Amino acid sequence: MKRSLMLFPKLLFIGLTCAVTLGVYGQQSGSVKRIYISTKGSDRNQGTIDSPYATADAALRSVEKYKNGKNTPGIEIIFMAGTYQLDKPIQMSAVVSGTTTHPLRIKSADGAKVILSGAKSLDLKWQEGDHGIWAAKVPRGTNFQSLYANDKHLVRARYPNYDPTVLPFQGYAADALSPERVATWKNPKGGIVHALHAGRWGGFHYEITGKDGLSTVTLEGGQQNNRPSKMHETYRFVENIFEELDTFQEWYLDEQEATLYFMPAKGINPNQLKFVAPQLENLINLSGSSSNPVHDIEVSGLCFMYTAPTFMKTAEPLLRSDWTIYRQGALMIEGAENCTFRANDFIELGGNAIFVNKYNRGLKIEGNRIEQVGAGAINFVGDPEAVRSPSFRYEKFVPFDQMDTIKGPRTNNYPKDCEASDNLIHNIGLIEKQVAGVQVSMAESLRILHNTIYNVPRAGINVGDGTWGGHEIAYNDVFNTVLETSDHGAFNSWGRDRFWHPNRKEMDELTTKHPNLILLDAIKTTKIHDNRFRCDHGWDIDLDDGSSNYEIYNNLCLSGGLKLREGFYRKVYNNVMINNGFHPHVWFQHSHDVFRNNIVMQSHQDIQVKYWGEEVDHNIYGLQGDLEKDQAKGIEKDGRVIQLNFTNPAHGDFRLKNWKDQGFKNFDMLHFGVISKRLKTLSASPEIPQPIQSLAKEQGGRWTWKSGLFKSVETLGEQSAAGLPSVNGVLLLQLDEKSNLYRSGLRVGDVVLNYQGEKIDQLIDLQQAIKKHVHADKPKVLIFRNQQQQELTLQL
């Protein structure tokens, strides 16, 4: 069933959206111990269906007492219908563990809608004031970051106003912090600034700590991205400012005055509405260790709702990836074995939905619905102490003579042999922008299967590092990705592992001299196969810095093609790239990369590739001109051109008609994404593109100056290869090593951003700047190299 897509609607009725479990499990034998919980129960009761407990704490104490160290038959904790407003998370330790044959089951009653809520109800007496703004007193000490009225998410007073049709942030403004606007704020302390990274590589969040004079604010925060930069000059907004409360559905909490302000829609009396405010970050917590794990527990049929936003706590760097993280989620799992989380709903959450933290083995996260989430959906994150010679920023590295060169992990404190399958994930990253549907960092042998992921600000699936590989990523349907950021993919990975160095020259020397370093961390091959990916704002599959030891086959790429930046041992075959193709960037001399038997619809878009790996050949083209362009590069000797006669492209079936399996082999293109009936009826599908046989874009103008060949940065590929924050600047393509420019420090691959104080966006800017400053014999230029700005003085 194809459903219409909305991008990030936040004002959403969610009161009746949680799962209703309809006999997920059959009746158990009479020996099963059943413990009941009801919103009308009491912890002084017996826990029976006629005398239920009121809390999960009481039920878990009953489990512990019943077990008392003995082997027992199966135990079920059954929530009866209702909303359970928790005042603290439900904690489960090893003492309540089940067994392989009799797991502890925590579930909703058959047919019951059960909500675990992290919010508290607000008892408010509203009084109408000026300009349509109502006010109500709250108890001293009350604080919250999000608010709901009759199950509708309300908007914290903000500028610019919320617009669900605008990305990013549902509204942004370059003047959000302008002196003129700041001057109108009497006391902005506690306000929040949300902004994209200058390169749109995720986002930042800052708290306003006060004013410096009349028209400037002071800020703290901005630690939510592991690639520090200034905030984006345009993509930013402010919230939690009283003076910005100026439109319907906005609210503002004055903590000093203990007063809540709200502007309802015309004709609405807020005294007739039910208000709740999220308080808890976590609703269920499984906590064990490798020596004493929580094990054999199943959680099903519950709806996790209303957790508090956690964006100001996102600060821990995940090795040298672009991410920082906050280790928390509505469902938090650490030190668990053989536990299953099935057919639950995670809706209207302020932070992460599910966090699998450090040591975990044999977990299954399956059949869940995850939507309207402030941060990420499913996160598998290990302990950096398990990594040998870790580094924690792009520009950091461990010198070889200090490096631990033992292969593999240092400890077992990371997720391994876990599965995330058949999950429906969409409309996440509503607050934080460096998030993913499934995030993997410092983990091994995960199975990410049959998930449907869409409407995300960045990647649908992200693998942050090579430690320790062995993942299977298959049968997923991932689309509407990278909607609010840039230079990324529907699938994205980094591999800044032990061999990787921020200076390319040093990395080349290191990997040539010590090739054994390459797979010290990525010890197992990660397989990406039989997925459907679509990214209209980047690449469908993006293996970025250092990503190594991958096998990629049988994937249908609908828009952005496939990119391999520098890395090793990538075998890519039998993929279909609609209206796009292959993007190799800055390859190593001995990469051992293979790209063969794929269908491409444009010539290879290589950038700074001198060496073509082990094999780039036997690929299938739709146009003779594209093949000839690639053959002129010394590759694709046995490439072929055929008529791309697809079976049923309008319905996404891009198998070749009457194909005899000559090299390329047809594969199933009709069964991606979720498989459970419940989720299939709720899921959307990607827009299927019409195949267009188009020539690759004509290369832009080139200009020779002082023995150097220059051109404008014109494509996303050129931007990504250089690590630029935007498609701007002038790229140096060729340079005579005997020239003055070379002696002045310029190198091939440098991007000129500024010449003698003149901003350089394209080639004509550089030409005009040189003419303007023709008398300057030592002009200063600002260049971009190794993803950093450098200033050089040219000796002309």
Spans of model-derived segments:
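Right-handed parallel beta-helix
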Residues: 295-306, 337-351, 361-375, 387-406, ...
